[in-house]
């Protein structure tokens, strides 16, 4: 029912490759715009983890320092099958936790320790730096061509498979809540299922634009989003040359909705595409609105910045930076089959 094989912008890649044969083949490092101020109520820890989820590390850390899990915060979840660094904050006002800066356990260790006056939460991150190793690459020339292509044109900004849980499990739970009226007391789980549902509907809308080759074009009535910002405006022209130029300069992007209570911003051709999806999934839309979700917008185009690659006898090491909330796998799927 929930196929996660979304249409590609540049067709199915010629090249195949092996990905994640080792956790070190997928490395992720968090990026922050500012610096931690070195003082405040929160101990801030830079963690390196391998083969563990963020939640598993948080629970392990909580046991070692004898603190409730609810006092430990993060700015984003990181993949399990990867080697990642991320920051965690521990609410410990006026408290010194002896030896915390050298703590380690199977699968994780602390690299740095400081303090900050605010706890970490989603929104703190400016982005993530990825280092990805692809092995047994069958067509290096096709891969290089595609890398050069996405440098300038970007890729569809789909939510990655991780968003939807194993085998789309989060979507099944969302269906039970939104359509069947199942009650879920755990606010975190409920929010995760709602996020999966909204992401699914966003991907459906974006996928239709990819099929029509309009995902990166400003349609009449489109919501346009400034790249790197939540600022939006509505395009009131059928094909605006100035907007096309700004899209080419990576200044703005057409955007698609994360459904909720609507402000009725969209008009024209763009509205028809959205309505087609909403009519098919009206029960989900009604459920999201009844649960108080507000409509939000997400850019259609994802730009991978600072792209570099090295090739050595069928192995390609690829590095790039993505904004917070973007998925490296949606870049990879435009480059190779894995």
From Swiss-Prot:
Q: Which SUPFAM superfamilies match?
A: Pseudouridine synthase (SSF55120)
Q: What class of enzyme is it?
A: isomerase
- In terms of domain of life, where is this protein from? Bacteria
Cite the InterPro entries for this sequence.
PsdUridine_synth_cat_dom_sf (IPR020103), PsdUridine_synth_TruD (IPR001656), PsdUridine_synth_TruD_CS (IPR020119), PsdUridine_synth_TruD_insert (IPR011760), TruD_catalytic (IPR042214), TruD_insert_sf (IPR043165), TruD_pseudoU_synthase (IPR050170)
Q: Name one GO cellular component term.
A: cytosol
Going by the UniProt record, its keywords in alphabetical order are:
Isomerase, tRNA processing
Catalytic site: 79
**Catalysed reactions, semicolon-separated:** uridine(13) in tRNA = pseudouridine(13) in tRNA
TRUD domain residues? 154-303
So what EC number does this one have?
5.4.99.27
Keyword tRNA processing recorded: yes
Give one Pfam family, short name only. TruD
**Any one Gene Ontology biological process term?**
tRNA pseudouridine synthesis
Q: List the GO molecular function terms.
A: RNA binding; tRNA pseudouridine(13) synthase activity
Which protein family is it in? Belongs to the pseudouridine synthase TruD family.
Q: What does this protein do?
A: Responsible for synthesis of pseudouridine from uracil-13 in transfer RNAs.
Protein name per its UniProtKB record: tRNA pseudouridine synthase D
Q: Source taxonomy lineage?
A: Bacteria, Pseudomonadati, Pseudomonadota, Gammaproteobacteria, Legionellales
């Amino acid at each position: 029912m929930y196929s996660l094989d979304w249409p590609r912008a540049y067709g199915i890649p010629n090249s195949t490759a092996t990905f994640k044969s080792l956790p070190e083949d997928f490395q992720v490092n968090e990026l922050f715009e500012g610096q931690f101020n070195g003082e405040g109520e929160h101990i801030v820890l830079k963690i390196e983890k391998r083969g563990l989820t963020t939640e598993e590390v948080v629970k392990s850390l909580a046991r070692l320092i004898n603190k409730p899990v609810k006092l430990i915060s993060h700015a984003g979840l990181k993949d399990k099958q990867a080697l990642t660094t991320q920051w965690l904050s521990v609410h410990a006002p006026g408290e010194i936790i002896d030896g915390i800066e050298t703590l380690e356990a199977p699968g994780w260790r602390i690299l740095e320790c400081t303090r900050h006056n605010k706890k970490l939460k989603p929104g703190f991150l400016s982005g993530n730096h990825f280092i990805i190793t692809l092995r047994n690459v069958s067509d290096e020339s096709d891969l290089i061509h595609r890398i050069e292509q996405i440098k300038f044109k970007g890729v569809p900004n789909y939510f990655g498979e991780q968003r939807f849980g194993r085998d789309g499990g989060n979507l099944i739970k969302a269906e039970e809540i939104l359509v069947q009226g199942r009650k879920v007391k755990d606010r975190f789980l409920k929010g995760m299922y709602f996020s999966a549902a909204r992401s699914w509907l966003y991907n459906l809308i974006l996928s239709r634009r990819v099929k029509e080759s309009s995902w990166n074009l400003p349609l009449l009535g489109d919501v346009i989003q400034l790249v790197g910002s939540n600022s939006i405006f509505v395009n009131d022209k059928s094909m605006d040359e100035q907007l096309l130029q700004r899209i080419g300069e990576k200044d703005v992007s057409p955007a698609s909705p994360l459904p909720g209570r609507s402000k009725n911003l969209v008009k024209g051709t763009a509205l028809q595409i959205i309505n087609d999806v909403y009519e098919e999934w009206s029960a989900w839309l009604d459920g999201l609105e009844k649960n108080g979700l507000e409509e939000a917008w997400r850019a259609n185009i994802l730009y991978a910045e600072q792209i570099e690659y090295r090739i050595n006898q069928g192995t390609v090491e690829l590095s790039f930076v993505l904004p917070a909330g973007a998925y490296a796998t949606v870049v990879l799927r435009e480059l190779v089959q894995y």
